[in-house]
């Protein structure tokens, strides 16, 4: 049973959008983030959960993605306007931790040709996995543009050592209804990952990149 109602979320979304689109409009597209605080959870003892949810609308349309591809997918990436690296490019990194860390920071997510996915850990070590950015596989039969949109629309809740998480659930150009729906979907999915569901939720806050925080719970 959800502890927050759509009317409650709508009230805050109205204020958030008014602030970002009227009171203080920025010259870039602000992301709307859901920030979560946990309680009665011990990341050392309790299971560290991880879950992904594909939202109906893409929260960050300008999210940066890089494709590790064979010749076919490197070509396709160019036509989709997405950065790509070949196996040779990855080999040139020479397992250098600094360079791999820089690559991991430069992009929000990665996609890899199915034929290459098994080589990624060998070429790049465990760093992408540690950052929660292990590539999503794509086959030659998949629509690459569709896959890029899927990756941009998928949010990930992953508990590490600290009891707070933040995920992008939308942006300030979205319609009010769309944003309310994305927030409710994200909250309900997140709560379903928790051991004791709502008993583990300490706080739920939504905020735009530069705007004030609105507490939902």
From Swiss-Prot:
Assembly notes: Component of the large ribosomal subunit (LSU). Mature yeast ribosomes consist of a small (40S) and a large (60S) subunit. The 40S small subunit contains 1 molecule of ribosomal RNA (18S rRNA) and 33 different proteins (encoded by 57 genes). The large 60S subunit contains 3 rRNA molecules (25S, 5.8S and 5S rRNA) and 46 different proteins (encoded by 81 genes). uL1 forms part of the L1 stalk.
Gene3D superfamilies per record: 3.30.190.20, 3.40.50.790
Recorded superkingdom = Eukaryota
User: Which keywords does this chain's UniProt record carry?
Assistant: Acetylation, Cytoplasm, Methylation, Phosphoprotein, Ribonucleoprotein, Ribosomal protein
Question: What is the similarity comment for this entry?
Answer: Belongs to the universal ribosomal protein uL1 family.
- N6-methyllysine PTM positions read 47
Q: What is the recorded name of this protein?
A: Large ribosomal subunit protein uL1A
Main location (coarse class): cytoplasm
Describe the function of this protein: Component of the ribosome, a large ribonucleoprotein complex responsible for the synthesis of proteins in the cell. The small ribosomal subunit (SSU) binds messenger RNAs (mRNAs) and translates the encoded message by selecting cognate aminoacyl-transfer RNA (tRNA) molecules. The large subunit (LSU) contains the ribosomal catalytic site termed the peptidyl transferase center (PTC), which catalyzes the formation of peptide bonds, thereby polymerizing the amino acids delivered by tRNAs into a polypeptide chain.
Q: Which residues carry this modification: N-acetylserine?
A: 2
Q: Check the record and name the InterPro entries matching this protein.
A: eL8/uL1-like, Ribosomal_uL1, Ribosomal_uL1-like, Ribosomal_uL1/biogenesis, Ribosomal_uL1_3-a/b-sand, Ribosomal_uL1_CS
What biological-process GO terms show up in the record? cytoplasmic translation; ribosomal large subunit export from nucleus
Organism of origin? Saccharomyces cerevisiae (strain ATCC 204508 / S288c) (Baker's yeast)
GO MF annotation terms:
RNA binding; structural constituent of ribosome
User: Where is the PTM Phosphoserine found along the chain?
Assistant: 79, 86
The cellular location(s) given in this protein's UniProt record come to:
Cytoplasm
PTM section of the record: N-terminally acetylated by acetyltransferase NatA.
């Amino acid at each position: 049973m959800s502890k927050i109602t759509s009317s409650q979320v709508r009230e805050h979304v109205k204020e958030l959008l008014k602030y970002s689109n009227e009171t203080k409009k920025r010259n870039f597209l602000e992301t709307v983030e859901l920030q979560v605080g946990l309680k009665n959870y011990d990341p050392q003892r309790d299971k560290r959960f991880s879950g992904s949810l594909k939202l109906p609308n893409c929260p960050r349309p300008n999210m940066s993605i890089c494709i590790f591809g064979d010749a076919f997918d490197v070509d396709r990436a160019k036509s989709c306007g997405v950065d790509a690296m070949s196996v040779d490019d990855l080999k040139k990194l020479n397992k250098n931790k600094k360079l791999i860390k820089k690559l991991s920071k430069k992009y929000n997510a990665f996609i890899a040709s199915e034929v290459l996915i098994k080589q990624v850990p060998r070429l790049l070590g465990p760093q992408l996995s540690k950052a929660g950015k292990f590539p999503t596989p794509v086959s030659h039969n998949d629509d690459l543009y569709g896959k890029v949109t899927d990756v941009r629309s998928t949010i990930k809740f992953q508990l590490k050592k600290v009891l707070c998480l933040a995920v992008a659930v939308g942006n300030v150009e979205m319609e009010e209804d769309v944003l309310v729906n994305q927030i409710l979907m994200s909250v309900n999915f997140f709560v379903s990952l928790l051991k004791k569901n709502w008993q583990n939720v300490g706080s739920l806050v939504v905020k735009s990149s530069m705007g004030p925080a609105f507490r939902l719970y």
